[in-house]
Each structure stands twice: as structure tokens, then as C-alpha cells.
């Protein structure tokens, strides 16, 4: 077993009271610190308090200690061990030090996974969380944003959420009205992290086709041809984006053409939706720009 201890700290040009007030909003609806939507938000099953359970993404933990305005410790859920903690330390001159510590006992396999895959992403997520503290707390704002390493970018791309198959949503009224009797329909869905756009117009770049109809939460794209017509619906509902495709063939040539295309269609739909999802997440403003900072 190896003891992994990972420490990040930064001096913030703001009082510990200001930074502590930001810390107390972690995991709330107006959380100004979680580096979402590029990273999964920190979510708990209740208010920030000892005993609250939650995590970010697939990392699960519970609040084992909480000193309001001063620090939080999260213990990893079994079978994992160890903890990670975020603390504010007062300094002279109306400044403070923010420190994040992760400590865990790891076997060889876990250590290799941590070293090669998880650590670059962990380092980046923590530094971006501290970036948000500096953005929100310091009168001069963020001096120098953290720069991602190549490995962190690669690993984040690899583990980015993948679309899941779903039925055509009932709320996708434009898709349902597109054709009276479509010959094909499918739908792929991704969750929307806090900070991602909820306006369907922001998602029109998923497919480079003509806008056929719009609704408050749905955008319908499509093209018509002599052999087939197709429509693609982008629906925003229940904190998810859903890409629905419906196709109507007109003749034998259309049926033969789509018999070939449908083999590649699921892959291309997932690829384009996932690519747009990632692009819009990186383009979103940071949390302090979306919430009212406590000063």
C-alpha cells in the first residue's frame, strides 16, 4: 500500500470571511466554486452539513467535518478510503490561504490508475475550483487562470459523458409532428451540467442543416430530397439535451440509401452530440460569472 498525499494551495487577496462565505455555498444551487460544466458539479443530498452524502461524477463521499467559513472534510465512500478537504487559513493584510488536501491509501493497481489517469484531472479540477475562489473573492479578480496539461485534456476528452439511447421524448412535439408515419426514429441523450446553455438555439451547431421549426425548448432541423426526408430535433428538458432523428423514405432508392446510412447513423449522432456538448461546456462562463458573488 502507498499513501498518496496531494496538496494544492494558493494565497487569495481577500479576507478569510469573504472566502469562507464562498466556501459555505459549495454544492448549493448558487454554488460559485464548482468548476462546472467542464467538470461534474459537487452535489450533496442535502445542505452542507456533517453526514451529507454526495460527490462529483463517479467519485462518492460524505461530509465528515464542517467548520462554517473555515473548512470542510469529505471522506470517500467505501470501498475507497481516505479523504479530501478544503480549508481557509487567515493571513496578515486581509489575505488568506486556501488549501486542498487529498490523502488515500492505495494498492498498486489503484496507484497506477491514480498516477496515469486520475491525478492530472484531479489537479486541474482543484486548481479551477481555486481559480473560481479567486475570481469571486479577490477585488482584482483572477490574475492567471490555471493552464491544462496535455494529459489532463486527453483524459478529460476520453471520459467525457457519452450519449445514451432513449425513446423519443414525449416533450419533443416538433419531432412527433414532423411526419405522420416515419420509417425510422431514434434518440440520444446527454445530461446538462450547471452552466450549460438551456436555449435550443445554442445547440443548432450539432448539425449543419436548415432550421425547420422552433419552440421554447426545441429546435427542428432537416433536409428534404427526392428519395427521403429527415428531421433532427434538439430538445432541452429535465436538465438533459436530446437529439432525435426521424426519417421518411419516398421510394426504393430512399430505402436502399437509408439501409446503408442507418448502420453509421447511431455512431455519427452520438459523435456530433457529444462534440457539441463538450464545446459548449468549455465555452460556458465560470461559476462566479453566473452567480452573485458574496462580498
Question: Model regions: which residues?
Answer:
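Hydrophobic ligand-binding cavity/cleft-lining segments
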Residues: 1-44, 143-210
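Beta-strand/loop substructures that line and gate deep hydrophobic ligand-binding cavities in soluble
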Residues: 76-135, 142-144, 226-262
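Well-ordered alpha/beta subsegment
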Residues: 262-282
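Hydrophobic pocket/interface hotspot
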Residues: 19-29, 63, 74, 98-100, ...
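A short, structured loop/turn motif at beta-sheet edges
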Residues: 13-17, 64-69, 87-97, 214-216, ...
Amino acid at each position: 500500500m502507498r499513501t498518496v498525499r496531494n496538496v494544492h494551495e494558493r494565497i487569495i487577496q481577500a479576507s478569510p470571511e469573504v472566502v469562507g462565505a464562498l466556501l459555505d455555498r459549495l454544492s448549493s444551487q448558487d454554488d460559485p466554486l464548482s468548476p462546472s460544466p467542464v467538470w461534474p458539479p459537487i452535489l450533496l443530498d442535502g445542505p452542507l452539513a456533517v453526514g451529507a452524502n454526495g460527490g462529483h461524477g463517479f467519485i462518492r463521499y460524505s461530509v465528515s467535518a464542517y467548520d462554517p467559513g473555515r473548512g470542510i472534510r469529505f471522506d470517500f465512500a467505501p470501498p475507497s478510503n481516505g479523504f479530501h478537504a478544503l480549508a481557509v487559513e487567515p493571513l496578515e493584510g486581509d489575505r488568506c490561504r486556501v488549501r486542498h488536501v487529498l490523502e488515500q491509501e492505495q494498492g498498486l493497481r489503484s496507484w497506477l490508475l491514480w498516477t496515469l489517469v486520475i491525478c492530472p484531472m484531479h489537479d486541474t479540477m482543484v486548481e479551477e475550483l481555486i481559480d473560481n475562489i479567486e475570481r469571486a473573492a479577490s477585488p482584482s479578480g483572477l490574475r492567471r487562470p490555471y493552464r491544462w496539461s496535455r494529459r489532463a485534456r486527453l483524459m478529460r476528452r476520453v471520459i467525457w459523458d457519452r450519449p445514451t439511447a432513449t425513446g423519443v421524448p414525449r416533450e419533443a412535439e416538433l419531432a412527433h409532428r414532423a411526419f405522420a408515419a416515419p420509417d425510422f426514429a431514434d434518440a440520444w441523450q446527454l445530461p446538462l451540467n450547471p452552466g450549460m446553455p438551456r436555449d435550443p438555439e445554442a445547440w443548432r451547431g450539432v448539425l449543419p442543416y436548415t432550421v425547420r421549426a422552433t419552440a421554447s425548448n426545441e429546435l427542428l432541423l432537416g433536409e428534404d430530397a427526392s428519395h427521403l426526408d429527415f428531421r433532427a430535433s434538439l430538445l432541452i428538458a429535465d436538465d438533459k439535451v436530446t437529439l432525435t432523428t426521424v426519417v421518411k423514405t419516398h421510394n426504393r432508392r430512399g430505402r436502399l440509401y437509408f439501409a446503408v446510412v442507418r448502420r453509421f447513423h447511431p455512431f455519427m449522432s452520438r459523435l456530433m452530440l457529444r462534440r457539441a456538448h463538450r464545446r459548449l461546456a468549455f465555452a460556458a462562463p465560470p461559476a462566479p460569472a453566473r452567480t452573485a458573488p458574496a462580498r
